[in-house]
Amino acid sequence: MSVIKKLPQEVVSKIAAGEVVINPASVVKELVENSLDANATSIEVQIRNGGKSYIKVSDNGIGMSRDDMLIAIDRFTTSKISALEDIYNIHSYGFRGEALSSIAEVSRLIITSSDGNNAHRLEVIGGKIIKITETHRERGTTVEVYDLFFNIPARRKFLSSEKVETRMVTEIVEKFMLVQPSVSFVFKIEDEIVYNASKGSLEDRFSIIFPEVKEFSLIEPLQSEIMQISGIISSPQYTRRNRSGQIFFVNKRFVIDNLLNLSFERGYGEALAQGEHPYGVIFLDFLPDKIDVNIHPQKLQVKFSDPQNVYNEIARTIRTTLRKFSFFQMSISKNSEEEEKYSSEISNQNLKAENYQHTDSEWYPNQFKNLYQKETPQTYRPYEPLSSISQNLLLPQLNEKSLPKEFIVLKDRYIVFEDLDGLVIIDFHAAHERIIYEQLKENKFETVQLLIPLHIKLGKSFLQLSQQLTDEFKKYGFDFEIKTLEDGSGEVVIKQIPSILKVTDASNVFLEVLEEYRIPFEKPKGLTYVLASKACKSAVKTGDKLSHDEVQQIIKEIKSKNLLTCPHGRPIMMKLSFSQLDSFFERI
C-alpha cells in the first residue's frame, strides 16, 4: 500500500491560501492592490476586531460583470497576463490570480460590484459559492471579509492580539497612502474615521503619517539607464531608534530589503550618530524586465538584475539631496577610490536576493539589542591590581556608619577618601549611573510639573499606542493628554515628566518607548529600558565639577546599598585596606 498520497483539493486550496493570506493586513494589502489595478481614485478601508471579524475595502474602480465575479474567485484567474513571458513585463500590482480565491477559501466573503451597467452581489463561504443576486451599486467594487480563518482554527489561534493586528493594518494603509497620493483614502477602525485623506501630494501624505518630522525634502528624480529614484527624506535631525520610518517601493510595491536600508543610511554618512535611523520614503521605478517580482508569496521581495548599481545609486542620490538642508555640511568624496570602496562594501554584504529568507523579526528591525554595550568605551580594560594586592579589591565593603569629612577629587573623575579601615577610590560617573538605575528599578524618583507643556504631533499608529500605554507612562512619572486635531492627526500634550529626565530629552524618550512597543513580533523592553538609557546618559560626566554635598550624596548611596558595578558591569570603586597598604610597603 502506498504511503505517499495525493492531497484532496480542499486541503491543497487551504495550504495555497495560507501562502498569500497570513493575517488581516495581508488581506487588506491584496484587496487595495485589486482596487488600484481597477483604476480606483477613491478607496475606503474598514476593519473590526483588528480585521479578524470584519474587513471591508470599497472603491470606485471599473468594477466587474457577473461573469467576471464568478471567475475571479477561482484560483489562477487574472486579466493581467496570458503567457509566461508576460510575468517579466508586469505593470500592475496583481498578476497571479490568487488573491480573491485565497481570501475566499478562508473566510465568509461578500463581493458587490458594478461595471456601470449591472450590479451583482456574490456570497462565498470557505471557497464555495452560496449565491449571486442582482443589486444596486454605482460603478466600482466592495469586498467584505467576515471571520477570517473561521475554517482553519489553528491559523486563527495564532493571529496576534486585536491591538497588534490593528496596528499592522494601519501601517499597510499608510504605505498605500504614501505610494498613491493621487488616490483619496478613508480608513476606519470600527466606526471611527482614522484617516480621511483627499487627493494630495507626497509631502502632504508624509506630513500626515510622520507629523513629528518638521524638516524634509523631496528627492529630485534621478534617471539612469535602468531605473529612476525619487521620494522624500528627513533631515539628519529627525531619526528613530529603528528603521520603521524607512519605506521602500519598487514599481510602487512595498518591499523589504535590508541592503536598501543600508544604502539609504550610507548616504547620510557621518551626519548620523550610532543607532540613529532617518526617515525616508523611496521610490525605485524599473523597466519591468530589469526586476523579478515573482519570488515571494506576498511580493514583498524583488530581485534586481544589477543590485550593486541600485544600492550605490541610492546612496549617491541621498547625498545629493542632503545638500538642500542649509545646516547640513558633509564632505562628499569624489575620489574614485572612495566610490570603489563603498561599492565593494555593499557587494560583500550577502548580495543574494534569491537566497534571502524573510522572517518576522526582519519586518521591523529592532535596534535595541544591547543598551549598555554601546556605552562601554572601546579602550576600557578591567582594573588590574598590583601583583601583591588581592583580586578582592574589586569587591569592596564600605563602612556604612559614617560619611567622610574630607575627600579629594582627582582629574575631575575620581573621588578619593579615607574609610575606617582603608583608602577608597570611586569613579563618580559610573557610580551616578548606578544610583540612577537603582532609582528607576525601585520607582523612587520625583516628578516635575512643566510650566510649558510639551506638544508632540503623532500619526494614528502612535496615537493608538499612546492611549494603550497611558498607565505604563504614569507609572514612571509622565502625565499627558491626547488631543485630536482638526486635520485628523493628533498630538500628545505632556504636562509632567520624571525628574531624572531632562526636559529636552522627554519628547525623544516618549517616542522611543512608542517605537519599542510598535514592533509586533518582539516583546518590548519597555519604558524602564529607554528611561535607563537616557538617565544614564544624563549622569554626571568626567570633567563635571561636583559640590561637596553632591559628593557626599554619591558616597552615601554607594555605602547604603553596597553598589559594586555600574549598569554596564564596570567597577564603581576600589578599596585598599590599611593592611594591604602596609603589606605593599613591607611594613608588616
Curated annotation (Swiss-Prot):
PROSITE patterns found in the cross-reference section: DNA_MISMATCH_REPAIR_1
GO molecular function: ATP binding; ATP hydrolysis activity; ATP-dependent DNA damage sensor activity; mismatched DNA binding
Coiled coil: none
Protein name listed in UniProt: DNA mismatch repair protein MutL
Function (record text): This protein is involved in the repair of mismatches in DNA. It is required for dam-dependent methyl-directed DNA mismatch repair. May act as a 'molecular matchmaker', a protein that promotes the formation of a stable complex between two or more DNA-binding proteins in an ATP-dependent manner without itself being part of a final effector complex.
GO cellular component: mismatch repair complex
Claim: Disulfide bond is one of the keywords in the record: no
Keyword Repeat: no
Pfam families linked: DNA_mis_repair, HATPase_c_3, MutL_C
Similarity remark: Belongs to the DNA mismatch repair MutL/HexB family.
Source organism of the structure: Fervidobacterium nodosum (strain ATCC 35602 / DSM 5306 / Rt17-B1)
GO process terms (BP): mismatch repair
PANTHER family for the chain: DNA MISMATCH REPAIR PROTEIN MLH, PMS, MUTL, DNA MISMATCH REPAIR PROTEIN MLH1
Domain of life (superkingdom): Bacteria
SMART domains attached to this UniProt entry: DNA_mis_repair (SM01340), MutL_C (SM00853)
InterPro entries: DNA_mismatch_repair_CS, DNA_mismatch_repair_MutL, DNA_mismatch_S5_2-like, HATPase_C_sf, MutL/Mlh/PMS, MutL/Mlh/Pms-like, MutL_C, MutL_C_dimsub
Keywords: DNA damage, DNA repair
